[in-house]
Amino acid sequence: MTIKTGTRRKSRELALQMLFQMDMGKQSADHVEKTFWAERKDLEEEVRSFAIDLFHVAEKRSEEIDKLIEKHAEHWRMERMAAVDRNILRGACAEFMGFPKTPKPVVINESLEIARRFSSPESVQFINGVLDSVARELDAERKKKS
């Protein structure tokens, strides 16, 4: 089944909103998911499904993802980053790890479009640099294993 680009972007934005809510509200993933979807019953199933899957990967692999982001965000600790930027990066890294069939340039481009919508112009450049570096490392690791 092929999912349209607009559908995927909507899912990514929803996953970002859940990650942001969990991060800023210091709430459990279960609580965030339950309350978030209680208010959004009218969304298409494919939008909802991919958003939930992406959120679950980001939540389950959060420590690994945060370490990876900090490694590639030179001179930036996670807590110093803007919350929106931090969670855009988390969502993209979760997609790199949990959905390896999605081309990394697509994930990066989608993340930049989301950053243009929800963050600042400076953040777009920052996110691009971090994700490009993360993608190169993950590709190098994958090549070593094969």
From Swiss-Prot:
A Pfam family it matches: NusB
Cellular compartments per GO CC: cytosol
Function: Involved in transcription antitermination. Required for transcription of ribosomal RNA (rRNA) genes. Binds specifically to the boxA antiterminator sequence of the ribosomal RNA (rrn) operons.
Alphabetized Gene3D superfamilies for the sequence: NusB-like
UniProt similarity note: Belongs to the NusB family.
Protein name in the entry: Transcription antitermination protein NusB
Keywords attached to this entry: RNA-binding, Transcription, Transcription antitermination, Transcription regulation
HAMAP family, alphabetized: NusB
InterPro entries: NusB-like_sf (IPR035926), NusB_fam (IPR011605), NusB_RsmB_TIM44 (IPR006027)
GO biological process entries: DNA-templated transcription termination; transcription antitermination
MF-aspect GO terms: RNA binding
Species the sequence originates in: Koribacter versatilis (strain Ellin345)
